[in-house]
From Swiss-Prot:
Subunit annotation: Component of the Mediator complex, which is composed of MED1, MED4, MED6, MED7, MED8, MED9, MED10, MED11, MED12, MED13, MED13L, MED14, MED15, MED16, MED17, MED18, MED19, MED20, MED21, MED22, MED23, MED24, MED25, MED26, MED27, MED29, MED30, MED31, CCNC, CDK8 and CDC2L6/CDK11. The MED12, MED13, CCNC and CDK8 subunits form a distinct module termed the CDK8 module. Mediator containing the CDK8 module is less active than Mediator lacking this module in supporting transcriptional activation.
Pfam (any one): Med18
Protein name, UniProt field: Mediator of RNA polymerase II transcription subunit 18
Domain of life: Eukaryota
UniProt organism field: Homo sapiens (Human)
Residues that bear Phosphoserine: 66
Entry GO CC: core mediator complex; mediator complex; nucleoplasm; nucleus
Major location category of this protein: nucleus
GO MF term list: transcription coregulator activity
Alphabetical list of PANTHER family matching this protein: MEDIATOR OF RNA POLYMERASE II TRANSCRIPTION SUBUNIT 18 (PTHR13321:SF2), MEDIATOR OF RNA POLYMERASE II TRANSCRIPTION, SUBUNIT 18 (PTHR13321)
Function text: Component of the Mediator complex, a coactivator involved in the regulated transcription of nearly all RNA polymerase II-dependent genes. Mediator functions as a bridge to convey information from gene-specific regulatory proteins to the basal RNA polymerase II transcription machinery. Mediator is recruited to promoters by direct interactions with regulatory proteins and serves as a scaffold for the assembly of a functional preinitiation complex with RNA polymerase II and the general transcription factors.
Length: 208
């Protein structure tokens, strides 16, 4: 899967603080084709991408109460594609008028020895999974419809089983901090997917 699009804003010094705006939902297996058909009609005039990714979640425990989390992901169906290292910050849930969950996001392409490097840095792998699905685009919005597979034998991505009888649906935008108006566009797009799927601003802490 590709990295999020890079902003075209000029950088005069330092780095741009990028944020991920996110809405999430799910759809049962038997409703998948109807949702795919709807997305084909609503999204940009191009064939949706398919992806098959292996993701590993690494933790680094320190003095702080909660561990530092990094995600390493690689494509299993695109030979030569780089590994991606991703950091997702704590969600900003305070603004009730904001229609999407917002969190700091850093996503970079790396060399293939990423996991060895993380282990040398003191991280340990917490869990891993395979994600398989479809990727649609609508302007700067990215819509992912995918199923998560549990890896039965650690490190063996050929030995998996589906985690549930549904597909996750994620609508996201990666943009510089302060561009909260994108959440309005996301809400309007999400409304067009009802009643097939209800995309919501979900606090991950509610799922713990």
């Amino acid at each position: 899967m590709e990295a999020p699009p890079v902003t075209m804003m000029p950088v005069t010094g330092g780095t741009i603080n990028m944020m991920e705006y996110l809405l999430q939902g799910s759809v049962l297996d038997h409703s998948l084709e109807s949702l795919i058909h709807r997305l084909r009609g609503l999204c940009d005039n191009m064939e949706p991408e398919t992806f098959l990714d292996h993701e590993m979640v690494f933790l680094l425990k320190g003095q702080q109460a909660s561990p530092f989390v990094l995600r390493a992901r690689r494509s299993m169906d695109r030979a030569g594609a780089p590994w991606h290292l991703r950091y997702l910050g704590q969600p900003e849930m305070g603004d009730k008028n904001r229609h999407a969950l917002v969190r700091n996001c850093v996503d970079i392409a790396t060399s293939e020895n990423l996991t060895d490097f993380l282990m040398e840095m003191g991280f340990r792998m917490d869990h891993e999974f395979v994600a398989k699905g479809h990727l649609f685009r609508k302007g700067i919005m990215k819509i992912m419809v995918y199923k998560i597979f549990r890896i039965l034998v650690p490190g063996n991505t050929d030995s998996t089983e589906a985690l549930s009888l549904s597909y996750l649906v994620e609508l996201s935008v990666v943009a510089p901090a302060g561009q909260d108006m994108v959440s309005d566009d996301m809400k309007n797009f999400a409304e067009q997917l009802k009643p097939l799927v209800h995309l919501e601003k979900i606090d991950p802490k509610r799922l713990m």
